Curated annotation (Swiss-Prot):
Binds 1 FMN per subunit. Binds 1 heme b (iron(II)-protoporphyrin IX) group per subunit. Belongs to the MsrQ family. Its cofactor is FMN; heme b. GO terms for cellular component: plasma membrane. It is a multi-pass membrane protein. Signal peptide: none annotated. This is Protein-methionine-sulfoxide reductase heme-binding subunit MsrQ. InterPro entries: Fe3_Rdtase_TM_dom, MsrQ-like. Heterodimer of a catalytic subunit (MsrP) and a heme-binding subunit (MsrQ). It is found in: Cell inner membrane. The keyword Nuclease does not apply. It comes from Escherichia coli O17:K52:H18 (strain UMN026 / ExPEC).
Length: 211
């Protein structure tokens, strides 16, 4: 049985709750000693992992809608992507304000350049910012064919974000490896599209170099 538009609306409500409840838990944990010995790191890792979960959920929607034959599921993809961006912004903010501190924000640019894992993180965030800003139907109409080209950069984020996570923890542990494995699996489900994008990019580079 296929989902109806009304059911998808209720699903969106549930997804909004899924995006909001972790924030409420985090606020509670901060105020009631629910974090570990290094609360700053705990906040950074929690916000980063939540952003990564929403990123992977966003990529899951298309194959899930296709294989389950539920085309209306696609309507939830933008919502998940926006929650991913919101949590990624909280992740970046927690690093800037809690790790560096308000008085040391001038160091942020240097940190992002000199620490490779932070460089990967900020590249991912900038891409997510662009995708969030252009996620409306009005922007889709305005950009035309370039809209899809821009939003294909989400695949780069899916590669960079797990690497950023693995690099940031500095030790090999199961959790970041699981996220990396899920990212690889979701990319593998799109291998034909990714191969086509790679061949197109290679052709464009070759044509420019031949000029």
């Amino acid at each position: 049985m296929r989902l109806t538009a009304k059911q998808v609306t209720w699903l969106k409500v549930c997804l909004h709750l899924a995006g909001l409840l972790p924030f409420l838990w985090l606020v509670w944990a901060i105020n009631h000693g629910g974090l570990g010995a290094d609360p700053v790191k705990d906040i950074q890792h929690f916000t980063g992992r939540t952003a990564l979960k929403f990123l992977l959920a966003t990529l899951l929607i298309t194959p899930l809608a296709r294989y389950a034959k539920q085309p209306l599921l696609i309507r939830t993809r933008r919502l998940l992507g926006l929650w991913c961006f919101a949590w990624a912004t909280l992740h970046l903010t927690s690093y800037a304000l809690l790790e560096l501190g308000v008085n040391n924000l001038a160091l942020l640019g240097k940190e992002l350049i000199t620490r490779p894992y932070l460089t990967l993180g900020i590249i991912s965030w900038v891409i997510l910012l662009a995708l969030a800003f252009t996620s409306t139907q009005a922007m889709q109409r305005k950009l035309g064919k370039h809209w899809q080209q821009l939003h294909n950069f989400v695949y780069l984020v899916v590669i960079l974000a797990p690497i950023h996570y693995l690099w940031s923890v500095k030790i090999i542990s199961p959790q970041p490896l699981i996220y990396a494995g899920l990212a690889v699996l979701l990319l593998a489900l799109r291998y034909k599209k990714l191969l086509s994008l790679f061949n197109r990019l290679r052709k464009q580079v070759h044509n420019k170099l031949s000029l």
